[in-house]
Protein backbone atom coordinates (compact mmCIF):
# COMPACT_ATOMS: atom_id res chain seq x y z
CA UNK A 1 0.00 0.00 0.00
CA UNK A 2 2.86 2.38 0.81
CA UNK A 3 4.31 1.90 -2.67
CA UNK A 4 0.95 2.78 -4.18
CA UNK A 5 0.69 5.91 -2.04
CA UNK A 6 4.22 6.95 -3.01
CA UNK A 7 3.32 6.64 -6.69
CA UNK A 8 0.21 8.77 -6.17
CA UNK A 9 2.22 11.44 -4.37
CA UNK A 10 4.64 11.49 -7.29
CA UNK A 11 1.71 11.67 -9.71
CA UNK A 12 0.27 14.60 -7.76
CA UNK A 13 3.58 16.42 -8.19
CA UNK A 14 3.39 15.75 -11.95
CA UNK A 15 -0.16 17.11 -12.11
CA UNK A 16 0.77 20.23 -10.17
CA UNK A 17 3.69 20.92 -12.49
CA UNK A 18 1.96 20.21 -15.81
CA UNK A 19 -1.56 21.55 -15.28
CA UNK A 20 -4.06 19.20 -13.69
CA UNK A 21 -7.06 20.82 -15.38
CA UNK A 22 -5.72 20.10 -18.86
CA UNK A 23 -4.71 16.54 -18.00
CA UNK A 24 -8.09 15.85 -16.38
CA UNK A 25 -9.87 17.44 -19.37
CA UNK A 26 -11.95 19.87 -17.28
CA UNK A 27 -10.78 22.96 -19.20
CA UNK A 28 -12.32 22.38 -22.64
CA UNK A 29 -15.89 23.62 -23.35
CA UNK A 30 -17.22 20.05 -23.26
CA UNK A 31 -15.04 19.29 -20.25
CA UNK A 32 -16.55 22.18 -18.31
CA UNK A 33 -20.04 20.86 -19.05
CA UNK A 34 -19.03 17.40 -17.84
CA UNK A 35 -17.49 18.93 -14.71
CA UNK A 36 -20.65 20.94 -13.94
CA UNK A 37 -22.78 17.81 -14.19
CA UNK A 38 -20.57 15.98 -11.72
CA UNK A 39 -20.61 18.95 -9.36
CA UNK A 40 -24.40 18.76 -9.26
CA UNK A 41 -24.34 15.00 -8.68
CA UNK A 42 -22.16 15.47 -5.61
CA UNK A 43 -23.25 18.81 -4.16
CA UNK A 44 -27.03 18.52 -4.55
CA UNK A 45 -27.11 16.09 -1.60
CA UNK A 46 -25.21 18.39 0.76
CA UNK A 47 -26.41 21.23 2.96
CA UNK A 48 -25.70 23.42 6.00
CA UNK A 49 -24.94 21.53 9.18
CA UNK A 50 -23.54 18.48 7.41
CA UNK A 51 -20.02 17.20 7.99
CA UNK A 52 -18.60 16.05 4.64
CA UNK A 53 -15.35 14.32 3.71
CA UNK A 54 -14.12 14.90 0.16
CA UNK A 55 -11.67 12.22 -0.93
CA UNK A 56 -8.96 13.13 -3.41
CA UNK A 57 -9.77 16.83 -3.62
CA UNK A 58 -6.81 17.46 -5.93
CA UNK A 59 -6.61 21.12 -6.95
CA UNK A 60 -9.99 21.97 -5.43
CA UNK A 61 -11.96 21.90 -8.69
CA UNK A 62 -14.91 20.35 -6.89
CA UNK A 63 -14.15 21.60 -3.38
CA UNK A 64 -15.07 25.17 -4.21
CA UNK A 65 -18.52 24.13 -5.42
CA UNK A 66 -19.10 21.66 -2.58
CA UNK A 67 -18.40 24.50 -0.15
CA UNK A 68 -21.26 26.52 -1.65
CA UNK A 69 -23.66 23.95 -0.15
CA UNK A 70 -22.92 25.34 3.31
CA UNK A 71 -21.70 21.97 4.59
CA UNK A 72 -18.50 21.71 6.63
CA UNK A 73 -16.02 20.19 4.17
CA UNK A 74 -12.87 18.28 5.08
CA UNK A 75 -10.98 17.98 1.78
CA UNK A 76 -8.14 15.46 1.70
CA UNK A 77 -5.43 14.31 -0.69
CA UNK A 78 -2.08 12.54 -0.43
CA UNK A 79 -0.36 15.23 -2.50
CA UNK A 80 0.91 18.33 -0.66
CA UNK A 81 1.46 20.08 -4.00
CA UNK A 82 -2.16 19.60 -5.07
CA UNK A 83 -3.45 20.64 -1.65
CA UNK A 84 -1.46 23.87 -1.88
CA UNK A 85 -3.17 24.66 -5.19
CA UNK A 86 -6.55 23.68 -3.74
CA UNK A 87 -6.09 26.09 -0.84
CA UNK A 88 -5.37 28.90 -3.29
CA UNK A 89 -8.41 27.99 -5.41
CA UNK A 90 -10.83 27.77 -2.49
CA UNK A 91 -10.23 29.37 0.90
CA UNK A 92 -13.85 29.22 2.08
CA UNK A 93 -14.19 29.28 5.90
CA UNK A 94 -16.16 26.02 5.87
CA UNK A 95 -13.33 24.07 4.16
CA UNK A 96 -10.38 22.42 5.88
CA UNK A 97 -7.58 20.76 3.88
CA UNK A 98 -5.59 17.82 5.21
CA UNK A 99 -3.01 15.35 3.90
CA UNK A 100 -4.58 11.94 4.40
CA UNK A 101 -4.33 8.46 2.93
CA UNK A 102 -7.90 7.42 2.10
CA UNK A 103 -7.06 3.78 2.85
CA UNK A 104 -5.86 4.61 6.38
CA UNK A 105 -7.79 7.64 7.62
CA UNK A 106 -6.89 9.16 10.98
CA UNK A 107 -10.48 10.17 11.82
CA UNK A 108 -12.59 8.47 14.49
CA UNK A 109 -15.47 6.27 13.47
CA UNK A 110 -18.87 7.82 12.80
CA UNK A 111 -17.57 11.32 12.10
CA UNK A 112 -19.07 12.29 8.72
CA UNK A 113 -22.59 12.63 7.33
CA UNK A 114 -21.34 12.05 3.78
CA UNK A 115 -18.20 11.05 1.89
CA UNK A 116 -17.90 12.28 -1.69
CA UNK A 117 -15.41 12.43 -4.53
CA UNK A 118 -14.92 12.55 -8.27
CA UNK A 119 -12.52 10.21 -10.06
CA UNK A 120 -10.72 9.17 -6.89
CA UNK A 121 -11.74 5.64 -5.89
CA UNK A 122 -10.09 4.16 -8.97
CA UNK A 123 -6.73 5.41 -7.66
CA UNK A 124 -7.09 3.50 -4.38
CA UNK A 125 -6.86 0.01 -3.04
CA UNK A 126 -10.62 -0.20 -3.24
CA UNK A 127 -11.36 -2.78 -0.54
CA UNK A 128 -9.32 -0.96 2.11
CA UNK A 129 -10.70 2.42 1.05
CA UNK A 130 -14.33 1.29 1.22
CA UNK A 131 -13.81 -0.15 4.69
CA UNK A 132 -12.37 3.17 5.86
CA UNK A 133 -15.17 5.17 4.24
CA UNK A 134 -17.74 2.94 5.92
CA UNK A 135 -15.97 3.29 9.27
CA UNK A 136 -15.86 7.11 9.32
CA UNK A 137 -19.48 7.54 8.21
CA UNK A 138 -22.19 8.18 10.77
CA UNK A 139 -25.05 5.67 10.94
CA UNK A 140 -27.23 6.29 7.84
CA UNK A 141 -24.38 8.36 6.36
CA UNK A 142 -24.18 8.42 2.57
CA UNK A 143 -21.59 8.27 -0.20
CA UNK A 144 -21.64 9.96 -3.60
CA UNK A 145 -18.93 9.31 -6.19
CA UNK A 146 -18.41 9.57 -9.93
CA UNK A 147 -15.87 7.13 -11.36
CA UNK A 148 -14.69 5.84 -14.78
CA UNK A 149 -16.58 2.91 -16.30
CA UNK A 150 -14.39 0.02 -17.48
CA UNK A 151 -17.02 -1.04 -20.04
CA UNK A 152 -16.44 2.17 -21.99
CA UNK A 153 -14.07 1.27 -24.87
CA UNK A 154 -11.78 4.29 -24.51
CA UNK A 155 -11.60 3.89 -20.73
CA UNK A 156 -10.79 0.18 -21.09
CA UNK A 157 -7.90 0.91 -23.46
CA UNK A 158 -6.65 3.86 -21.44
CA UNK A 159 -6.55 1.93 -18.16
CA UNK A 160 -5.08 -1.32 -19.53
CA UNK A 161 -2.55 -0.39 -22.24
CA UNK A 162 0.56 1.01 -20.51
CA UNK A 163 1.71 3.42 -23.25
CA UNK A 164 -1.83 4.79 -23.65
CA UNK A 165 -2.09 5.21 -19.89
CA UNK A 166 1.12 7.25 -19.89
CA UNK A 167 -0.02 9.34 -22.87
CA UNK A 168 -3.23 10.31 -21.05
CA UNK A 169 -1.32 11.25 -17.89
CA UNK A 170 -2.71 8.45 -15.71
CA UNK A 171 -0.96 7.30 -12.56
CA UNK A 172 0.59 3.80 -12.72
CA UNK A 173 -1.94 2.04 -10.47
CA UNK A 174 -5.20 3.73 -11.40
CA UNK A 175 -7.91 1.63 -13.01
CA UNK A 176 -11.69 1.80 -13.62
CA UNK A 177 -14.72 -0.13 -12.39
CA UNK A 178 -17.24 -2.62 -13.70
CA UNK A 179 -20.41 -1.61 -11.92
CA UNK A 180 -21.74 -5.02 -10.84
CA UNK A 181 -18.56 -6.20 -9.05
CA UNK A 182 -18.29 -2.76 -7.45
CA UNK A 183 -21.89 -3.00 -6.28
CA UNK A 184 -21.19 -6.40 -4.70
CA UNK A 185 -18.09 -5.05 -2.99
CA UNK A 186 -20.04 -2.13 -1.53
CA UNK A 187 -22.68 -4.51 -0.20
CA UNK A 188 -20.07 -6.87 1.26
CA UNK A 189 -18.51 -3.87 3.03
CA UNK A 190 -21.90 -3.22 4.66
CA UNK A 191 -23.45 -0.52 2.50
CA UNK A 192 -27.15 -0.70 1.64
CA UNK A 193 -29.42 0.95 -0.91
CA UNK A 194 -26.53 0.79 -3.38
CA UNK A 195 -27.15 2.46 -6.73
CA UNK A 196 -24.60 2.62 -9.54
CA UNK A 197 -25.73 4.13 -12.84
CA UNK A 198 -23.67 4.57 -16.02
CA UNK A 199 -23.70 8.10 -17.44
CA UNK A 200 -21.90 10.49 -19.80
CA UNK A 201 -21.29 9.87 -23.48
CA UNK A 202 -19.94 13.39 -24.06
CA UNK A 203 -16.25 13.32 -24.95
CA UNK A 204 -14.20 16.21 -23.49
CA UNK A 205 -12.67 16.92 -26.92
CA UNK A 206 -16.07 17.44 -28.58
CA UNK A 207 -16.00 20.53 -30.87
CA UNK A 208 -18.01 23.49 -29.57
CA UNK A 209 -20.42 23.41 -32.52
CA UNK A 210 -21.42 19.82 -31.72
CA UNK A 211 -21.62 19.92 -27.93
CA UNK A 212 -25.35 20.64 -27.55
CA UNK A 213 -26.45 18.00 -30.05
CA UNK A 214 -24.07 15.30 -28.87
CA UNK A 215 -24.83 16.02 -25.23
CA UNK A 216 -28.56 15.63 -25.88
CA UNK A 217 -27.94 12.43 -27.84
CA UNK A 218 -25.76 11.11 -25.03
CA UNK A 219 -28.52 11.77 -22.47
CA UNK A 220 -30.84 9.76 -24.72
CA UNK A 221 -28.35 6.86 -24.86
CA UNK A 222 -28.11 6.85 -21.06
CA UNK A 223 -31.72 5.65 -20.97
CA UNK A 224 -31.23 2.90 -23.55
CA UNK A 225 -30.92 -0.66 -22.19
CA UNK A 226 -27.56 -2.30 -22.94
CA UNK A 227 -26.15 0.75 -24.74
CA UNK A 228 -26.14 2.76 -21.50
CA UNK A 229 -23.70 0.26 -19.99
CA UNK A 230 -20.95 1.66 -22.25
CA UNK A 231 -21.14 5.24 -20.95
CA UNK A 232 -17.90 6.80 -19.78
CA UNK A 233 -18.64 7.12 -16.07
CA UNK A 234 -20.48 5.61 -13.11
CA UNK A 235 -22.59 7.53 -10.58
CA UNK A 236 -22.32 5.75 -7.22
CA UNK A 237 -24.62 6.23 -4.22
CA UNK A 238 -25.04 4.16 -1.08
CA UNK A 239 -26.09 4.37 2.58
CA UNK A 240 -24.31 3.03 5.66
Map each language-model feature to its residues.
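Conserved class I S-adenosyl-L-methionine
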Residues: 1-46, 49-58, 144-166
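Class I SAM-dependent methyltransferase SAM/SAH-binding core
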Residues: 59-104
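A C-terminal cap/extension of S-adenosyl-L-methionine-dependent methyltransferases
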Residues: 97, 142, 158, 162-163, ...
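A conserved beta-strand element that flanks and buttresses the S-adenosyl-L-methionine
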Residues: 116
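Acceptor-substrate binding/catalytic loop of class I
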Residues: 124, 166-181
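A short glycine-rich, Lys/Arg-flanked "PGG" loop and its adjoining helix->strand segment in the class I
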Residues: 128-142
Amino acid sequence: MQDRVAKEIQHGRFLAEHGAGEIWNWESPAGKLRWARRVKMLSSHLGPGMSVLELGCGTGYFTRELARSGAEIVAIDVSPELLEIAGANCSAPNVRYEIQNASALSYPGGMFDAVVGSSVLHHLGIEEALREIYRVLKPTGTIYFTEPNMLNPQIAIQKNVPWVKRKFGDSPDETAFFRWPLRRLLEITGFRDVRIDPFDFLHPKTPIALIDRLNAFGRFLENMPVISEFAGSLYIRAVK
